[in-house]
UniProtKB/Swiss-Prot annotation:
Entry's localization field: Cell membrane
Family: Belongs to the ATPase alpha/beta chains family.
Keywords for the protein's UniProt record, in alphabetical order: ATP synthesis, Cell membrane, Hydrogen ion transport, Ion transport, Membrane, Transport
Protein name: A-type ATP synthase subunit B
Organism name: Thermoplasma volcanium (strain ATCC 51530 / DSM 4299 / JCM 9571 / NBRC 15438 / GSS1)
Domain of life: Archaea
SUPFAM superfamilies the UniProt entry points to: C-terminal domain of alpha and beta subunits of F1 ATP synthase, P-loop containing nucleoside triphosphate hydrolases
NCBIfam families: PRK04196.1
């Protein structure tokens, strides 16, 4: 398709450029904006109506005027030059290298606006992904092909958790090719330096592709970045048959950018000012996770978001929870106690956990052990609340054991060092060790055979 150039810029409003008399502009079409001083900037068509093209500019609008500005329509949507050589590299929000390395010699240029995986073509998620974190592996297991978000709050250690998962995540079969695609949106320069240093110093970068968008970068880059990251993941997973873990942070910043652009377009706002199509937009990102029938590759997603005001009913976590398959919740109360990573297992859930655990995946006792730990910890937390009213002296001896179990469970199971990588065997054995402080007769959720084989109770 020939590239057509127009000089009919009628208005500039915030990050948007309005170009008149453009009869055939296409939705998501890429454009080059040529200034009268010779400078060129990129943009993308957000909307077209009656010959008017609304273009979102990548970058500042400084220096762009209605006179002398030429807009060249490329006749194609955004495409990413892609190659296996992207592993070990760091890119900005639109896929340009920012690590001082050479340009990528593309083996292919792929459209970044890929569709969600066709349900008929999907294979059911299965197989365990080990993160090395007990609260996830033991009680909210991540399954290959799943989308499992992390719900956090401002000031909580979700950045450290993201870096730790990226460093430690693995599939148990060492013959499988595994890699991480990491995308960060709207982060500060300090956070960007933290992530790049962590990935480099720990060696995680060698099996990772990083995309970083700073808070000072254009909002449109935050909209494009997750799609670029997922396009990279799809190439590695479905063409190179690798197992890819995609970590996206912070999806709240993504939604804020969506709201900003929607406001600039003067669209009717939905809940709390977010666009009414935010659910659909988020689904086009989350539904790109999964496995394809007849293909050995897979894409597993861990989107991370901060809940404004720690409100889990806020539109961003609320809509994310509808689309994804569970959630891992980082607790402010546990964080105040000095417990890292501070995952609240009672508020967390992995809906696909049963498909990736048990005999042939992790260990035969995994499901029952997790249920027993949930039950014991919940009982201990209930007794904490009761103790605040009646005092510990009013509790029975058995109740006091559950009260102490809750404290021990938080200090030994939920708490672990940033560089502590626990195997699934270590996590399961630790669970049995903690349960040994409770009466064996109370173990109603684990099979007697498993108690006999794995239990740590002393024989009298």
């Amino acid at each position: 398709m020939p590239k057509l150039t127009y000089k009919s810029v009628s208005e500039i409003s915030g990050p948007l450029l309005f170009v008149e008399n453009v009869p055939n502009a296409a939705y998501n079409e890429m454009v080059d904006i040529e200034l009268d001083n010779g400078e060129t900037r990129q943009g993308q068509v957000l909307d077209t109506r009656k010959g008017l093209a609304i273009v979102q500019i990548f970058g500042a609008t400084t220096g762009i005027g209605t006179e002398g500005t030429r807009v060249k329509f490329r006749g194609e949507t955004a495409r990413l030059p892609i190659s296996e050589d992207m592993l070990g590299r760091v890119f900005n929000g639109i896929g340009e290298p920012i690590d001082g390395g050479p340009e990528i010699l593309a083996k292919e240029r792929m459209e970044i606006t890929s569709n969600a995986i066709n349900p008929y073509s999907r294979e059911e998620p299965s197989e365990f992904i080990e993160t090395g974190i007990s609260a996830i592996d033991g009680m909210n297991t991540l399954v290959r092909g799943q989308k499992l978000p992390i719900f956090s709050g401002s000031g909580l250690p979700h950045n450290q958790l993201a870096a730790q998962i990226a460093r430690q995540a693995k599939v148990l079969d060492s013959s499988e090719n595994f890699a991480v695609v990491f995308g960060a949106m709207g982060i500060t320069s300090e956070e960007a330096n933290y992530f790049t240093n962590q990935f480099r110093e720990t060696g995680a970068l060698s099996r990772s592709v990083m995309f970083l968008n700073l808070s000072s970068d254009p909002s449109m880059e935050r909209i494009i970045l997750p799609r670029i990251a997922l396009t990279t993941a799809e190439y590695l997973a479905f063409q190179k048959e690798m197992h890819i873990l995609v970590i996206l942070t912070d999806m709240t910043n993504y939604c804020e950018a969506l709201r900003e652009i929607s406001s600039a377009r003067e669209e009717v706002p939905g809940r709390r000012g977010y666009p009414g199509y935010m659910y659909t937009d988020l689904s086009t990102i989350y539904e790109r996770a999964g496995k394809l029938k007849g293909n050995n590759g897979s894409i597993t997603q861990i989107p991370i978001l901060t809940m404004p005001g720690d409100d889990i009913t806020h539109p961003v976590p609320d809509l994310t929870g509808y689309i994804t398959e569970g959630q891992v919740v980082v607790s402010r109360d546990l964080n105040r106690k000095g417990i890292y990573p501070g995952i609240d297992v009672l508020l967390s859930l992995s809906r696909l956990m049963n498909q990736g655990i048990g005999k042939g995946h992790t260990r035969e006792d995994h499901r029952g052990l997790a249920d027993q730990l949930y039950s014991a910890y919940a009982s201990g937390k209930d007794l904490r609340s009761l103790t605040a009213i009646v005092g510990e002296e009013a509790l029975s001896q058995n109740d006091r054991k559950y009260l102490r179990f809750a404290d021990t469970f938080e200090e030994r199971y939920l708490k672990q060092d940033f560089f502590e990588d626990r195997s699934i065997e270590d996590t399961l054995n630790l669970g049995w060790e903690l349960l040994a402080d409770l009466p064996e007769s109370d173990m109603k959720r684990v099979k007697p055979d498993h108690i006999k084989k794995y239990g740590k109770w002393k024989k009298e």
